[in-house]
Structure formats: structure tokens, C-alpha cells
Amino acid sequence: MISIFKILSSPKPATTTTNIINPINIINGIRYFSSNQEDYPLFKKPVFNGKVLRGGRKVFKNDLIYSKKESHYNNNNNSNNNSNNNNNNNNSNNRNNNNFSNNRNNNNNRNNNNNNSNRNNNNSNDNNFRNNNNNNRRTEYYKNDFDSSKYISNKPEIRIFDLHEQAVYGINPVWVALSSGNRTFNALYVCGTLLPKLKELGIDIKNIENSKREYISDFDHNYGRETNQIEDENQDEQYSNQHDEQEQNEYEEEQEEEKVQEEEEDNNNNNNIKKTTFNRYNDRKNLVALKEIVKNSFKLKIPVRSVNKGTLDSFSKGRPHQGIILDASPLTLLNIDFLEKFDINERVNKRMNGGGGGGGGGGGNKINNDKYPLWLVLDELWDPQNVGAIIRNCSFFNIDGVVISNKNSSPITPAASKSSSGACESFVINRTESIEGFLKSSQRNGWNVVGTSLDDLNENQPCLDINQIKLDQPTILILGNEGFGLKPSVLEICNKTIKIVGGNYKIDSLNVSVTSGILIHTLLSSGTLPK
């Protein structure tokens, strides 16, 4: 019992304490702070360049690390000195625990005297450091790069060369859009690398505006902008121009090499027959069409501006633009509620007179006057590229018209126009609020509604193969969504449903744009108007 009591009542061993570095001691720009949470929360994280290296709060300009106020800083020094005294006393008591009481007292007195002198020295050094280096420590040790002189105000600024509406990109879409009356135009943007070729083709490039990445404001051209920012922008422009010049120089070198090869081939040819070589650059850019585009823009008084390729990429959102973009208004679509009753005599008269026009709906497209009218309805298609490819098929086969649902369908975007190779710009496209209402109203006027599906309508109306149907009356062909096809409410209105039979059971359907081309070609080839 005695031994146990001695063990329980024995003094606790002294806890080991870490050496606390005085705040004025700085090692490679790293500061350490007191662990006394009463005076100041624990913060022993190294700080460099205004950031905490291993967690903790960030330190910014005019932020005192070890004191939110000067009083905290003073209290922190006192707490540090007291903690140093306590630690020294505890260490001395533990080391001299087996000595006599007189020696212990002498040691304590000696330690106290030393601590008092050290404390006075620390306080004097601390005051000198704070008074002499108060400003230098914030910039030298924190290394904060913040400079209020470089701050740019939020004054509204507008780039001179910027899009106002939609970006119609691609040579064919731009070419067709300029000749049609479905859009209004703001500006034409041409890649700077095409200017030398346009000059060779006889275009006066002096009328083409050059981009300098300039900004305009309501009051001052350079309001709120520092010289460093302007220099950076000029450097960026110089780099882009150098890059464009390198591309142009490479192209010119290739052209010279091709000319040399052609001359050598001509000299070696006894018949003096000039051999033509395929020029990828001319084929890709289609410089002849580009020349007509620039000429038409000058005639229509549309500003033509030269920009670098990066600007064109940003306008087209990374899609291939072929070096030309037209800033234009959205495409105009016509509203339609139903198709009128078809008059076969009017169709025959137009065929005899060589005229064109819509078949029953007034579509305005050039159509096949020797065939019954065929209209295509797109019900809730989501992909604009599919919509563009389908309209391209419709324009190629000269059907009477296209109707798009105004709800839950992809609009005619620049991506659809590019996918249609410009067909969306000239082919008249109609839209309706209700597909079901449009079909029912047209059906009452004698139109045959044909849907596309893989399943039968019912037991009495099986789904027919495409070869089992003929275009022997005015017909409306419906194509459904890429995923789920036609809606049940639309299938109930259909007089017939057709499908394309494939040979691979693992793939049960085709892309909707491919399906449209096959169905339109098959229907137009299956019947003609009576003579």
C-alpha cells in the first residue's frame, strides 16, 4: 500500500516544451508566434509572398501578422517573456530537485536576475525593431505585389471589333446569307492571312479596317487603363501578327516551290502541256467565293475588318470558320398554322409555264412541279447539326417546304447554318406553335400524314417498308426526336408509318439526317403528277 501511495502521490514529470522563437527573430522571411491562445490565437504557420505555406489564413497588405492591434502585440511580448521565465524556472527546479534547499534558492535568484535582464533586453530590441522597421517589414518580408496604381476601375468599355448579334461562319453560309434577305448585317470579319491573296485577286485592301485591339469609352479612350496594360496588349498583338506573318511566309514559300515544280514539269514535257497541281490552300479557302463575298460587302456598305485567327476562333466558339465570319441578325422564320388545299391544276400550269412556288403552303422554294407536293415536319429535334443537314437535303431535292416545332426544338443557329452549307440562309423555313394542330388542320385539307417509326400503329395498320408507299397525293413526312422518335400524340394523327429495313440487327436505326435523305429521295422517285 505504501509503494502504491508513493507512486500515486509522486509529482508529475515535467512536460517538455518547445522553444518559442521571439517574434522579432526572422529566419528567411518566416515568422513564428506565441502559442498563448488567450492573448492571440495559435498561429505558427510560415508566411511568404502574402500566402500561408502550410495552411492558415492569408496575409495581405497592411495586415499585421502577430497583432490585430498594437495592444495585442505588447501583450504578446509579455506573455512570451512570462512563458520563458516559467519554462526556465521549471527546468531549473527539475534539474536541481535532489539538491539542498539553499542551493535551490540561490539558483532561483540567479535565474530570476538573468531573466529580468534578458526581458529588458528583449523589450528594448523589440521597441527598436517596431519603431525603425515598421514599414520595411511589410514590404521586405511579406513581399506583397499588390499595387493600387495598377487597379483598373469598372468603367464600361467596349471593344471596337466585337460581335453584336450572331456569328455566321463559313464561306458558303456567308456567301448565301449576303444574297438572301433573311438577315441584317453589321460587319464582315476576314482573317488577316487572306489579305495578300485578296490583293492578288484585285480587291482593294485599303478599304479593309485593321484591328489594333483598341478600346473606346464614353469619355476617354484610355480611361482607367495603365501604360503597362496597353503595352501588354500591344505585345500580344505583335505576337499574333508575327504568327500570322510566319504562316503567310510559309504559304508563300510553298507557292514558290509549287511554281518551280510546275516550270520544271513544263520544261520536261515535250508537248508543252501544263500540268495542274492540287492546291490545298486555294481549295480550302475557296478564294473565288471569298472575293465575291468581299465585293458584295462593299456594295452593301458592310464594314469589312481584318482580324487574327484567335479572334475568329472566339467568335465561332472554336468551330471551323474558314477564315471568314459575318456578324448578322438571327435568321427569320415564317409562322404557319396549316397547309392549304392542294390544287392540281395550278401545279400543272406552273409546270407548263416553267414557274415555281410552294405546293399548297406558299413556301416560296423552287420545287418539283411534275410531282405531288412533299413537306417535311421536324418534331422536337435537339441537335442543330442534324437540323442543318436535314435542311440541306431538303434544299438539294427541292421539296416544297420545312416546318419546325417552336417548342422543345433546336433553333436555326449558326452551327445549323454551317452544317447545311448555307441552305438555311436561302431555303424558306416555317415554324409552328403546335405540331399536332398543324397536322390536324392540314389533314382536313386533304394532306396525307406519314410518320416514321419502327413499330406498327396498331393491328390493322402495320408499319410499311419504304418501298411499299408512293407519292400519289400531297404528303407530309414527319421526323421525330433523335432518341425517342415521334411522340404518341403525333403517331395517332398519322395515316401511315414507314421504316427503312436494315441488315444489321445490332443497329436498328440510322441518323435522322441520313434517314431524311433516303426517305425524300425514295418518295420523290415513286410517283409523278398525271399528264
Curated annotation (Swiss-Prot):
Region Disordered: start-end pairs: 70-141, 230-277
Main location: mitochondrion
Gene3D superfamilies registered for this protein in UniProt: 3.30.1330.30, 3.40.1280.10
InterPro entries (UniProt xref): Alpha/beta_knot_MTases, MRM1, MRM1_MeTrfase_dom, Ribosomal_eL30-like_sf, SpoU_MeTrfase, SpoU_subst-bd, tRNA_m1G_MTases_N
Gene Ontology MF terms: RNA binding; rRNA (guanine) methyltransferase activity; rRNA (uridine-2'-O-)-methyltransferase activity
Cellular compartment(s): Mitochondrion
Compositional bias of kind Acidic residues: 247-267
Top-level enzyme category: transferase
Entry's family note: Belongs to the class IV-like SAM-binding methyltransferase superfamily. RNA methyltransferase TrmH family.
Protein name: rRNA methyltransferase 1, mitochondrial
Organism for this UniProt entry: Dictyostelium discoideum
Organism ancestry: Eukaryota, Amoebozoa, Evosea, Eumycetozoa, Dictyostelia
Gene that encodes the chain: mrm1
